[in-house]
Amino acid sequence: MSRVCQVTGKGPVTGNNISHANNKTRRRFLPNLQHHRFWVEEEKRFVRLRVSAKGMRIIDKRGISVVLAELRRDGKV
């Protein structure tokens, strides 16, 4: 399973670890992904999504029904 948020599309980005001696080695910054079950009142069932913390805030703000409708329209769910 890829490390991509289903709501925001956020994925890993690359950067550097930098030591005290200013040595640089490559690293990945991973999004804060969580598996979360959301209750959809219109469908009377749970929907399980892999979302970032930012994605959960978007769902809290706009509502799960609106977000799900957009994901289904775009073919992401």
Swiss-Prot record:
Q: Which UniProt keywords apply?
A: Ribonucleoprotein, Ribosomal protein
Quote a single Gene Ontology cellular component term: cytosolic large ribosomal subunit
Looking up InterPro entries in the UniProt record yields: Ribosomal_bL28, Ribosomal_bL28/bL31-like_sf, Ribosomal_bL28_bact-type, Ribosomal_bL28_sf
| Record-level GO BP terms | translation
Q: Where is this region: Disordered?
A: 1-20
Superkingdom assignment: Bacteria
Q: Which Pfam families match?
A: Ribosomal_L28
Q: Name one GO molecular function term.
A: structural constituent of ribosome
Gene3D superfamilies (UniProt xref): Ribosomal protein L28/L24
Record's family?
Belongs to the bacterial ribosomal protein bL28 family.
* Protein name listed in UniProt: Large ribosomal subunit protein bL28
Q: Report the source organism.
A: Pseudomonas fluorescens (strain Pf0-1)
Q: Which gene encodes it?
A: rpmB
